[in-house]
């Protein structure tokens, strides 16, 4: 077992540090050019569509979702424990400058996720009973109609079911169990039972219940976390300018805070920012297109602009709030990490220490635990939907109940078990599913360019 663990860890290291960073950043640059900077040109349009659709009690649809429900479901999956623990890890290893590189990655990722949403809309399938299905498996088969496409789509479907539907849920429920046990002394297995029961109620309700839950939970959890972060920043407002200064300073000269030569330090800052940013906003990963395919919109371009807002919310709002709070309290003002890592502070407790510096230990730990609970549970709900669509693709609707039952078992087991191999396998399948998704995106990039150009031409005619 130890040998297998080492093999999987080695595969993950090469995938995350080299293959995926080059692939995903390259795709972001490529689609930025092909769409003529759609993330800049249509940024305002995306927000207008977001606020135009915003609702905590959205209209019920016989099939699919509203545009806002689709975005809420996507954001539910995007905004997870990585927005807290992942951001802390990037800062601890790569220094405050890692956040700058997260912003750069997210900017280009907005073009990639636009492409994913457009293709998901273009290739979605409406079944005779009105059920809407869509996602990478459908545009992979459009890109490669023969045997190769069938193989790639099948590979993607299996990878995402394992990575998100089953093992990924274990990782998220484990975070919930640990957070609540540390903050409230509730046994992790008890939280596992509670989370599993609530998840079962949602899963059995199908797509409509998932949409109804995510459109309510996402605005609440985001506002709660941002409010707590704002309180900390206001309390430490004299250090906010220094915080932004550290982000930009250590983006290009991180060696003084993380050690090593300038080349090694700069590589570490960039790789940590890129890796954590990519895995947080999921642009190019092939997960969120499942939600965007279900949106009932007039044109694929419309949902593409809304999808970009998901990346912005995840990285430029929620993840950035974590970064500002942590840097403002633990780095700025000659904080405990101002001169590098110290014993007793790790990525798993940085957020608690940061919020506790203003809220006090008890309230700070409780606040982070509650936010982690919201973030992790919403991710479980979103990921379950993505896995369900791929189960339908492979086995048909008859397998939905069995899939939900297995997912619920994994959620409970994850709350009270900690297995490094499971965590590493989750990362491996999560990264492997990027490969077929990216191949199909590039192969169908002409469709994306046409959608962006058509909107641009129509906009010019209206002037």
PLM features per residue range, with description:
Residues 2-4, 34-39, 82-87, 165-177, ...:
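Transmembrane helix-loop junctions in multi-pass membrane proteins
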Residues 108-116, 193-207, 218-238, 271, ...:
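Selective recognition of specific alpha-helical transmembrane segments in multi-pass small-molecule
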Residues 23-30, 34, 38-47, 156, ...:
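Membrane-interface loop-to-helix entry segments
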Residues 58-92, 119-122, 128-137, 141-143, ...:
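Alpha-helical membrane segments and immediately flanking helix-loop junctions
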């Amino acid at each position: 077992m130890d040998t297998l663990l080492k093999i999987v860890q080695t595969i993950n290291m090469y995938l995350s540090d080299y293959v995926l960073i080059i692939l995903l950043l390259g795709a972001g640059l490529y689609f930025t050019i092909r769409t003529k900077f759609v993330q800049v040109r249509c940024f305002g349009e995306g927000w207008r569509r977001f606020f135009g659709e915003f609702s905590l009690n959205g209209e019920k649809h016989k099939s699919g979702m509203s545009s806002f429900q689709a975005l809420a479901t996507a954001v539910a999956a995007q905004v997870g424990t990585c927005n807290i623990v992942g951001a802390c890890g990037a800062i601890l290893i790569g220094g405050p400058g890692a956040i700058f590189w997260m912003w750069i990655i997210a900017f280009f990722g907005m073009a990639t996720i636009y492409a994913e949403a457009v293709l998901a809309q273009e290739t979605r399938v409406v079944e005779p009973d009105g059920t809407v299905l869509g996602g990478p498996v459908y545009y992979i088969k459009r890109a490669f109609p023969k045997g190769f496409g069938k193989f790639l789509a099948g590979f993607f479907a299996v990878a995402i079911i394992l990575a998100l539907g089953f093992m990924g849920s274990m990782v998220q429920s484990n975070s919930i169990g640990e957070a609540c046990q540390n903050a409230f002394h509730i046994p992790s297995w008890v939280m596992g039972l509670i989370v599993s029961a609530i998840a079962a109620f949602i899963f059995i309700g199908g797509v409509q219940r998932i949409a109804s839950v995510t459109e309510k939970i996402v605005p609440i959890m985001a506002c709660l976390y941002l409010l707590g972060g704002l309180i900390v920043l206001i309390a430490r407002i004299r250090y906010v300018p220094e915080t932004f200064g550290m982000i930009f300073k250590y983006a290009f000269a991180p060696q003084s805070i993380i050690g090593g030569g300038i080349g090694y330090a700069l590589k570490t800052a960039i790789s940590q920012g890129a890796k954590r940013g990519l895995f947080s906003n999921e642009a190019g990963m092939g997960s969120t297109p499942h939600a965007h395919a279900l949106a009932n919109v007039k044109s694929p371009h419309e949902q593409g602009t809304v999808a970009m807002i998901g990346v912005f919310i995840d990285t430029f709002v929620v993840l950035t709030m974590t970064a500002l709070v942590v840097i403002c309290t633990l780095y700025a003002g000659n904080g405990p990490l101002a001169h590098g890592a110290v014993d007793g502070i790790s990525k798993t407790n940085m957020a608690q220490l940061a919020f506790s510096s203003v809220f006090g230990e008890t309230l700070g730990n409780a606040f982070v635990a509650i936010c982690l609970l919201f973030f992790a549970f919403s991710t479980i709900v979103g990921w379950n939907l993505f896995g369900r669509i791929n189960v339908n693709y492979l086995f048909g609707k008859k397998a939905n109940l069995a899939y939900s039952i297995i997912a619920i078992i994994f959620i409970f087991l994850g709350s009270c078990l900690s297995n490094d191999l499971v965590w590493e396998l989750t990362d491996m399948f999560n990264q492997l599913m990027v490969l077929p998704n990216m191949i199909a995106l590039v192969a169908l990039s002409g469709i994306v360019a046409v959608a962006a150009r058509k909107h641009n031409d129509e906009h010019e005619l209206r002037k």
